[in-house]
């Protein structure tokens, strides 16, 4: 039965990722459409890259159980201005990294162009998946005596899109309805074209671009819907720009978070009280332990892929958010009570460690903790998680809302 439930969740996740996982604007549209199909009391959508769903509590409305995730993922953005580069070997689009990536891992793989362009006073969306693919080529090792591939610079991240610039521009105008001038301030990116696939003889592992953090976004959305009517108000938030620091208008440093709570209260005083009384899960992935890189992990506090959802009380050199003592233990007891496999995880403080949005909620006075599935090959074009961990994360999120 558990295996069947894992597969059901996996199939839903695969459908979402294959169709909408290429970019956060597609994810926000998907979440909005799902909200329209379900029983939601309030939808707060802001500037195409932020959305929050609210279901009012049956008895308790002066606080909320909140799960927040981000729907952006590392990618290659087409640079603004004039991104076209014409060389003797073809026409290229110049890209810049969005988020932390290892440049070499994004070469010699199939890429698709996604995003949006402002043309003829309207937004035109682009997604070439399933139709047109592109790539960035590497230098053959026979000619790389200077080890240029080892110390790759961002200026080599050029995506070849054709032979002749006029033909390329004619294509964009005839098929997409956009001109060269429209590229100056476009919001376009190249992302891997891979569909979600199963890995291993047991098929327990899931390979996909963008598990960070769309796996957590998916689990929180499903848990929000499946938990039904609850005594306490529940909120699920999907933000963006986490991979670059959450500083933009649709990131978690924005005042937009306060606005969500203001919509649910009568005045600023009660709104601040509601925030301070609320419990928040920062749903973000954690680093999956790998024995071949064991010196980079805290072996006594590492999450192994396939062994359960990761509960992260603190992380990073500066510890980021340090989850309140009582709250972290309440979450642990919730997992035990519901027979949910969990692991305690934290990064090795001498090795750095990533940041999440939890610290921005902590500064507002919320009880907040980081929870997410362990991931292998994080920030690569094809990240890896476990079906069992995805199910455990969903179960814990659902129990959090229900309790």
What are these regions (language model features)?
Residues 1-403:
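N-terminal hydrophobic/helix-forming segments and targeting peptides
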């Amino acid at each position: 039965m558990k295996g069947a439930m894992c597969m059901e969740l996996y199939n839903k996740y695969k459908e979402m990722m294959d169709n909408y996982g290429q970019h956060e604007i597609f994810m926000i549209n998907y979440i909005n459409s799902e909200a329209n199909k379900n029983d939601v009391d309030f939808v707060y959508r802001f500037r195409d890259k932020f959305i929050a769903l609210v279901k009012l509590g049956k008895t308790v409305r002066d606080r909320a159980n909140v799960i927040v995730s981000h729907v952006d993922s590392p990618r290659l953005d087409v640079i603004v201005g004039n991104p076209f580069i014409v060389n003797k070997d073809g026409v290229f689009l110049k890209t810049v990294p969005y988020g932390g990536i290892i440049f070499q891992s994004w070469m010699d793989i199939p890429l698709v162009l996604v995003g949006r362009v402002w043309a003829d006073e309207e937004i035109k969306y682009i997604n070439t998946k399933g139709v047109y693919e592109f790539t960035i080529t590497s230098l053959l090792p026979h000619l790389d005596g200077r080890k240029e591939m080892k110390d790759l610079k961002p200026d080599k991240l050029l995506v070849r899109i054709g032979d002749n610039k006029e033909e390329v521009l004619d294509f964009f105008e005839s098929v997409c309805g956009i001109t060269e001038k429209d590229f100056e301030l476009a919001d376009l990116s190249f992302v891997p074209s891979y569909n979600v696939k199963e890995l291993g003889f047991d098929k327990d592992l899931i390979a996909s671009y963008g598990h960070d953090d769309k796996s957590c976004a998916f689990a929180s959305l499903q848990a929000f819907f499946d938990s039904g009517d609850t005594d306490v108000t529940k909120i699920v938030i999907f933000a963006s720009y986490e991979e670059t620091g959450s500083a933009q208008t649709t990131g978690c440093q924005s005042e937009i978070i306060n606005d969500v709570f203001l919509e649910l209260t009568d005045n600023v005083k009660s709104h601040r009280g509601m925030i301070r009384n609320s419990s928040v899960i920062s749903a973000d992935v954690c680093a999956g332990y790998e024995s071949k890189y064991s010196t980079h992990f805290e072996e006594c506090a590492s999450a192994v892929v396939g062994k359960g959802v990761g509960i992260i009380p603190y992380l990073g050199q500066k510890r980021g958010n340090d989850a309140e003592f009582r709250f972290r233990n309440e979450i642990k007891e919730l997992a035990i009570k519901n027979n949910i496999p969990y692991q305690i995880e934290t990064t090795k403080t001498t090795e750095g460690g990533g940041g999440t949005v939890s610290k921005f909620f902590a500064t507002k006075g919320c009880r907040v903790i980081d929870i997410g599935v362990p991931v292998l090959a994080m920030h690569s074009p094809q990240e890896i998680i476990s079906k069992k961990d995805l199910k455990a994360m969903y179960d814990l999120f659902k129990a959090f809302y229900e309790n």
